[in-house]
Amino acid sequence: MTTSLQDGQSAASRAAARDSPLAAQVCGAAQGRGDAHDLAPAPWLHARALLPLPDGTRGCAADRRKKKDLDVPEMPSIPNPFPELCCSPFTSVLSADLFPKANSRKKQVIKVYSEDETSRALDVPSDITARDVCQLLILKNHYIDDHSWTLFEHLPHIGVERTIEDHELVIEVLSNWGIEEENKLYFRKNYAKYEFFKNPMYFFPEHMVSFATETNGEISPTQILQMFLSSSTYPEIHGFLHAKEQGKKSWKKIYFFLRRSGLYFSTKGTSKEPRHLQFFSEFGNSDIYVSLAGKKKHGAPTNYGFCFKPNKAGGPRDLKMLCAEEEQSRTCWVTAIRLLKYGMQLYQNYMHPYQGRSGCSSQSISPMRSISENSLVAMDFSGQKSRVIENPTEALSVAVEEGLAWRKKGCLRLGTHGSPTASSQSSATNMAIHRSQPWFHHKISRDEAQRLIIQQGLVDGVFLVRDSQSNPKTFVLSMSHGQKIKHFQIIPVEDDGEMFHTLDDGHTRFTDLIQLVEFYQLNKGVLPCKLKHYCARIAL
């Protein structure tokens, strides 16, 4: 009798295993642990009753008997096709292991604008940094990443903006905006963002820097930069600034001192004695902004304004407005305040641009060049047989020659339509070629050109080419040098019926603007420096 019961029990177990693979796995695991007697069903139970039923189904038989006694018509019950899965006590455990966990990182939609006011909406996590937002836009738009792409916070109601540092959390920046404020995030290049690490001599003039302790000999700008990053010693920035009085429209010229603890001004001339110094602003709970139209918006004496704004929503009353005499002075003040506020974090952003807090790490970011692009080699097809060019200098010269040949073919193609003269052919070719270049900005004014260059950083060699407003058939090269913007007229010269472009009264001539720009990117010539970075308006 006992043997027959055990045989029936094992048969029922095998039937249950066939009906429910999950139950078979659980039972098999239990038998491996020696717990088979705890899970073994009684011999008089059906195979489908191996696993206990939920509490709601235990009294079904009693309810049916009560309904039968009361002559209540019974509704036909719908059988559960998988009672083992829904009734198993192990269901919650198995589900937790088999199904992926939900992502706990909250996401938020942000809108980012470009210089032409086109925008793009991004669904980003709450801990995304400014650098990661830039990286997303670079990848989505297939831009070249030269580490100069920057996210800007633009506050139009008070006419200021600032660079959002690469490590800052974008959602925290947005949380400080007022509900009715029409603030924007702008995405554009800023070549001057970390330029002070490369060329500190342009950012710290000798007459504006002093030291708390006496120093032996002269201190180089590189040593001054190292002092800003250290925690023991620090330089002191000082000079005259125009300050707007609180609650008034008037400005007052005062002597200021910038120290690690904050910004102070002297109540007695240029004296820096403690009894003559009065506190003006600190850095911890404030951000430094640059004024966009100080004269027009705030009645400033110059356009080189900057201000301190608390980390909260507010209007012009919360601003502490300052104004410098020249661009170099403003750049020195703003750079020193950034260094004192963020310290080594700025240097880490400069050295390790991809180390963000969110998911966009250096491993998840695709490189600038793909594997297939890196495997490309330079080839020369000028002879009867093609050959691989191994010398980089030769490869560059061949590429230049091919570019010139392509432009000559373009001239011939344009010359086949009708019978224009050589001069008209050259002008038509120029119109067809240079308008497609990102550095050409067509009919923009002198002020607009200066605004674009200032926005993208007053670094030596930042340039653009535009149409001349004074001479309709000529062009102008606008460039930055020494934190100043200079404009050079590109003069057309005709020789033997052919038109050329020149910057030096015809000593160096170019058939088109592309040749001119490429030449001055490699040679200084009559310019104060080589052309390095072009200003480009991008669309998102």
From Swiss-Prot:
Residues 106-192 form the Ras-associating domain. It is a peripheral membrane protein. The modification Phosphoserine is found at S372, S375. GO terms for cellular component: cytoplasm; cytosol; endosome membrane; intracellular membrane-bounded organelle; plasma membrane. The modification N-acetylthreonine is found at T2. The keyword Cytoplasm applies. Its main location: cytoplasm. GO terms for biological process: insulin receptor signaling pathway; negative regulation of insulin receptor signaling pathway; signal transduction. Keywords: Acetylation, Cytoplasm, Endosome, Membrane, Phosphoprotein, SH2 domain. Expressed at high levels in the liver, kidney, pancreas, testis, ovary, heart and skeletal muscle. PROSITE patterns: PH_DOMAIN, RA, SH2. Residues 234-342 form the PH domain. It is found in: Cytoplasm; Endosome membrane. Phosphorylated on serine residues. Phosphorylated on tyrosine residues by TEK/TIE2. Residues 439-535 form the SH2 domain. Adapter protein which modulates coupling of cell surface receptor kinases with specific signaling pathways. Binds to, and suppresses signals from, the activated insulin receptor (INSR). Potent inhibitor of insulin-stimulated MAPK3 phosphorylation. Plays a critical role regulating PDPK1 membrane translocation in response to insulin stimulation and serves as an adapter protein to recruit PDPK1 to activated insulin receptor, thus promoting PKB/AKT1 phosphorylation and transduction of the insulin signal. The PH domain binds relatively non-specifically and with low affinity to several phosphoinositides, the best binder being PI(3,4,5)P3. PANTHER family: GROWTH FACTOR RECEPTOR-BOUND PROTEIN, GROWTH FACTOR RECEPTOR-BOUND PROTEIN 14. Interacts with the cytoplasmic domain of the autophosphorylated insulin receptor (INSR), through the SH2 domain. Interacts with GRB14 (via BPS domain); this interaction protects the tyrosines in the activation loop on INSR from dephosphorylation. Binds to the ankyrin repeat region of TNKS2 via its N-terminus. Interacts with activated NRAS. Interacts (via SH2 domain) with TEK/TIE2 (tyrosine phosphorylated). This is Growth factor receptor-bound protein 14.
